[in-house]
Regions:
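A short, N-terminal "cap"/entry segment at the start of jelly-roll beta-barrel domains
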Residues: 1-38, 118-169
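Active-site region of the double-stranded beta-helix
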Residues: 13-66, 71
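Glycine- and acidic-residue-biased ligand/ion/polar-headgroup-sensing regions
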Residues: 50, 59-76, 183-204
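Contiguous mid-protein beta-loop-alpha structural module that forms a pocket-lining wall or clamp
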Residues: 73-81, 85-121
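Short acidic-glycine-tyrosine-enriched beta hairpin
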Residues: 75-94, 202-222
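Double-stranded beta-helix
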Residues: 100-145, 229-247
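Regulatory nucleotide-sensing modules
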Residues: 164-169, 176-185
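C-terminal functional regions that serve as terminal interaction/effector modules
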Residues: 190-198, 206-247
Length: 247
């Protein structure tokens, strides 16, 4: 499966929500996900309102969150969440709260399989299952300066994390103008998300700009992306398979 996540679709799907604690947010789905098929990936931008709190919770699927705007904190860590911080939480792993700063905080949530929704702690603690718990967070992955990016003579791929034995990995790829990069999936990963953080990339003639993305299942990898008149930069988030403990 290969899906393109576009801003046009996200804007058409934009809807406001509110949690039980009063936290308000906008949700922008980048592509359509079936509510009836667990094998449907999810990718959506959350715009969390200023000075609001997304309470501690867990999900039943592995997920990445890519923070894209604003500032906040997560859990007990004093480290600020800024663009472009990557946070990974495994299935049935509690995390949070996510506390938004005075300008709010935005983040893209990505899953290879559909999740029915957050399970809040302590209210839904009885739904937690026994098994491995895992989370990981990067430093802010700053885009390359425009002059340095324009001076590149060939694509440059930097490993940010992994690959781990279960397939968890994060890469940062920079492409000069008129270049091509065959993005390969990490061994053992079930899928990867390719997110544009600077410039424009193309996939089979479809142009993808900032925050637009590609979902690529392992069976459809590798994925060729190109640039034309200007350089670009992407993050590649490799999703581990569900742990057998939660099968």
């Amino acid at each position: 499966m290969l899906l393109l996540g576009t801003r046009e679709f996200a804007q058409s799907a934009r809807k406001q929500g509110q949690l039980h604690n009063g936290m308000r947010y906008w949700r922008n789905d980048f592509f359509k996900s079936s509510d009836d098929d667990v094998c449907t990936p999810q990718c959506y931008l959350v715009e969390q309102f200023p000075d609001s709190v997304n309470p501690t919770h867990f999900h039943v699927q592995n997920q990445f969150q890519l923070f894209t705007r604003g500032e906040g904190t997560i859990g007990r860590s004093p480290k600020p969440l800024q663009a472009f911080t990557v946070h990974y939480a495994g299935a049935y792993t509690g995390y949070g709260p996510i506390v938004a700063g005075p300008e709010g905080v935005d983040y893209i949530t990505m899953r290879a399989f559909r999740d029915p929704g957050a399970k809040f702690v302590p209210q839904q603690r009885e739904l937690m299952r026994v098994g491995p718990k895992r989370h990981w967070a990067s430093e802010a992955l700053l885009p390359m300066e425009a002059g340095e990016l324009a001076a590149l003579q060939a694509p440059r791929a930097d490993g940010v994390h992994g690959p781990d034995p279960d397939g968890l990995a994060v890469d940062q790829i920079r492409l000069p103008a008129g270049a091509a990069s065959e993005v390969r999936i990490a061994p053992a990963a079930v899928a990867m998300f390719i997110v544009v953080i600077q410039g424009v990339v193309e996939r089979n003639g479809q142009r993808l700009g900032r925050l637009e993305n590609l979902f690529v299942s392992a069976s459809d990898a590798p994925c060729l992306i190109t640039t034309t008149e200007a350089p670009a930069e992407v993050l590649v988030l490799h999703m581990p398979a569900p742990d057998p403990a939660y099968a």
